[in-house]
Design a protein with these regions (language model features):
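C-terminal cap/loop subdomain of S1 sulfatases and analogous C-terminal strand-loop tails that border
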Residues: 1-7, 11-13, 34-35, 46-49, ...
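Short, solvent-exposed loop/helix junctions and linker helices
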Residues: 39-46, 63, 133, 137
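Intrinsically disordered, low-complexity polar regions and short flexible loop motifs
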Residues: 120
């Protein structure tokens, strides 16, 4: 009778900023969809707004935080370099920013976590608990800049 199933824990499922809480599979089929298989593009729920509007004939490439993912239905492309999420649980606000390779979680209390989403997709090894490689430090700097820009 557990809500969380391995490899997730009660702290890394819905209601959290870990992949178990914010990653939702999306299945798309229909007229004009000729791609098959799986795609790991960074899509957020707001992207549905512009995508549906475009499919209904409304023109535009970006409305507020919504980006159309229609190009993904027919070709292997990228629509988003970063994916942003935030959580307010009433006691400690927290924010997450990720790109295809890394994810940074920042809590209002100052705690930070960083994960390699390629080699550690279940976020078991917080990279900030040890010295970062040059590549990891560079990625952290980029994620921090993007998070700061989004939150302004």
């Amino acid at each position: 009778n557990q809500a969380a199933q391995s490899p997730y824990t009660n702290q890394t499922v819905k209601g959290s900023l870990y992949q178990g809480g914010i990653n939702t599979p999306m299945f798309i089929s229909g007229y004009g969809v000729n791609r098959t298989g799986m795609d790991n593009n960074l899509i957020v729920s707001t992207d549905l707004y512009l995508t549906i509007a475009n499919l209904c004939g409304v023109q535009g490439t970006q409305i507020y935080d919504s980006k159309s993912f229609i190009p993904l239905l027919t070709s292997n492309t990228t629509i988003r370099d970063f994916q942003y999420s935030e959580m307010d649980n009433g006691t400690n606000d927290s924010w997450a920013i990720r790109n295809l390779n890394y994810k940074l979680i920042v809590n209002a209390n100052g705690n930070e976590e960083m994960y390699d989403m390629i080699s550690d997709p279940y976020e078991q090894n917080n990279l900030l608990l040890s010295n970062l490689s040059n590549d990891q430090q560079s990625a952290k700097n980029i994620l921090e800049l993007e998070l700061s820009a989004i939150r302004q």
